[in-house]
């Protein structure tokens, strides 16, 4: 909701402002980010209200969820591979822009910042324009998002000009704007109310897992051939899309 929109708004403004600041020096965005972190910390200390005291509910034994729980396993598979692919691509995107367009370091920061802003704007637009207007199940949203992401990776692999790179970034942002919330809400809806804390931990670990493996693979593949990370991710997402198509969304039973 509002928190997700705020995150996407930051994703739009941050790269755009960072690209402008990089025109001063490449270290300027880092100094400004440090200053913003300090301002945020002061705001939290002096202005953020205390959380209301929760009424004590009857204690229920917390249930540990396994990654292999059949209710959430499909979402765990999708989440881990999805975030691995995204991390693999994001690790090499700035190099891709620099190599394809023949840019200097400063020009790369400015151009890539603009592209990241466009990607975040597309993510926000897909959430506001689609997810909040149409009531579809998480798997249906994943079925829409996966082809968009597959097309984005193909565009990144084939790109030989700035326009195709920007199109790829917009597609990637729109696809992840649908896939990310669908993955998290799908895992949450698959379990009971008293298991929400456990499933949040399990599902939340898919992102760090993907971003642990993905960058290592991205750098390795990029050294071999610059378009290889994107073709590899393209190849990973094809069976992932087939897997999503093969799953029949199940309605959660109410007790």
Write out the residue ranges for each language-model feature:
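Short amphipathic helix-loop junctions that connect adjacent transmembrane helices
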Residues: 91-110
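Structural signature of the two symmetry-related core transmembrane helices
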Residues: 140-155
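Helix-loop-helix hairpin linking two adjacent transmembrane segments in secondary transporters
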Residues: 6-45
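A late C-terminal transmembrane helix in Major Facilitator Superfamily
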Residues: 194-223
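Helix-to-loop junctions at the C-terminal end of transmembrane segments
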Residues: 125-138, 222
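Symmetry-related core transmembrane helices of the 12-TM Major Facilitator Superfamily/SLC fold
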Residues: 29-46, 229-246
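Juxtamembrane intracellular "pre-TM" segments in multi-pass secondary transporters
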Residues: 49-77
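Intracellular juxtamembrane helix-capping segments at the cytosolic ends
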Residues: 178-191
């Amino acid at each position: 909701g509002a928190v997700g929109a705020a995150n996407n708004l930051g994703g739009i403004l941050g790269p755009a402002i960072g690209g402008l600041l990089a025109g001063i020096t490449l270290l300027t965005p880092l100094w400004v980010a440090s200053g913003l972190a300090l301002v945020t910390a002061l705001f939290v200390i002096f202005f953020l209200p205390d959380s209301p005291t929760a009424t004590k509910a009857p204690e229920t034994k917390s249930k540990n969820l396994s990654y292999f729980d059949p209710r959430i396993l499909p979402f765990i598979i999708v989440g881990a591979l999805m975030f691995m692919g995204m991390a693999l691509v994001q690790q090499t995107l700035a190099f891709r822009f620099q190599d394809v367009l023949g840019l200097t370091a400063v020009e790369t920061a400015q151009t890539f910042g603009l592209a990241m802003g466009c990607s975040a704007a597309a993510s926000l637009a897909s959430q506001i324009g689609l997810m909040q207007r149409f009531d579809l199940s998480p798997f249906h949203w994943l079925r829409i998002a996966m082809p968009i992401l597959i097309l984005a990776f193909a565009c990144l692999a084939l790109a030989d000009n700035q326009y195709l790179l920007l199109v790829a970034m917009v597609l990637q942002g729109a696809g992840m704007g649908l896939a990310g919330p669908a993955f998290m809400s799908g895992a949450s809806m698959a379990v009971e109310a008293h298991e929400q804390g456990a499933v949040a931990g399990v599902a939340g670990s898919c992102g760090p897992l993907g971003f642990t493996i993905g960058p290592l693979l991205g750098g390795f593949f990029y050294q071999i051939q610059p378009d290889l990370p994107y073709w590899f991710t393209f190849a990973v997402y094809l069976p992932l899309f087939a897997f999503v198509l093969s799953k029949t969304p199940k309605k959660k039973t109410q007790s």
